[in-house]
């Protein structure tokens, strides 16, 4: 819901895009759109054919759109998977890494938030993202950019599903979808 629309947007601006999908159907769908697609699974180590991995890492910039799960295999799995991807990119001398984080690193802060605003995550996934951001900022030999995304909605991400069965004590308080 994020990677494919981003890839298509970049391609419409003339960028060559190489990407990974976890299923062969996903790889074929990406290729049908003109994306140089390859299969890759995270367990949390990378499971990928060596030639495909070389193609995936032969890029000017690596964009990581792997979402931190609120439920699922767990925080350690996510942390290890992201670190495995980044370590592999560094071994392949990828010069630039763009990591999609979340405004959940700010916790329950309200008002206008800036990059320099204090991070105080209130969820396990927010804490893992904060730790990964810190780790990424300290990597030598590569340029790292971190985007803290919020409010991602679309055909497969309807806002109502995030609020179903929950009470909102303060209707004026910001929410992170």
Kindly label every feature range from the protein language model.
Residues 19-24, 41-43, 151:
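N-terminal Rossmann-fold cofactor-binding loop
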Residues 102, 133-155:
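Conserved beta-loop-beta element that borders a ligand/cofactor-binding pocket
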Residues 33-59:
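Conserved Rossmann-fold cofactor-binding substructure of NAD(P)-dependent oxidoreductases
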Residues 75-79, 115-134, 175-177:
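Short-chain dehydrogenase/reductase
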Residues 84-122:
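Conserved Rossmann-fold NAD(P)-dependent oxidoreductase catalytic core, especially the SDR/UDP-sugar
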Residues 158-177:
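A conserved pocket-lining segment of Rossmann-fold NAD(P)-dependent short-chain dehydrogenase/reductase
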Residues 3-4:
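N-terminal Rossmann-fold NAD(P) dinucleotide-binding loop
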Residues 57-98, 131:
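NAD(P)-cofactor binding segment of oxidoreductase domains
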């Amino acid at each position: 819901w994020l990677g494919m629309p981003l890839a298509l947007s970049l391609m419409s601006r003339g960028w060559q895009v190489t990407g990974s999908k976890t299923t062969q159907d996903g790889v074929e769908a990406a290729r049908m759109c003109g994306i140089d697609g390859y299969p890759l699974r995270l367990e949390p180590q990378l499971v990928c054919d060596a030639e495909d991995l070389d193609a995936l890492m032969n890029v000017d910039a690596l964009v990581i759109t792997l979402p931190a799960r609120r439920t699922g295999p767990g925080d350690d799995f996510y942390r290890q998977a992201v670190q495995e991807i980044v370590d592999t990119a560094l071994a392949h001398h990828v010069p630039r890494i763009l990591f999609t984080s979340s405004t959940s690193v700010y916790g329950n802060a309200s008002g206008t938030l800036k990059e320099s605003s204090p991070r105080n995550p209130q969820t396990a996934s927010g804490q893992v993202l904060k730790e990964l951001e810190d780790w990424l900022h300290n990597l030598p030999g590569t340029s790292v950019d971190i985007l803290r995304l919020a409010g991602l909605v679309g055909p497969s991400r309807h806002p109502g599903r995030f609020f179903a069965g929950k009470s909102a004590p303060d209707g004026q308080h910001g929410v992170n979808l």
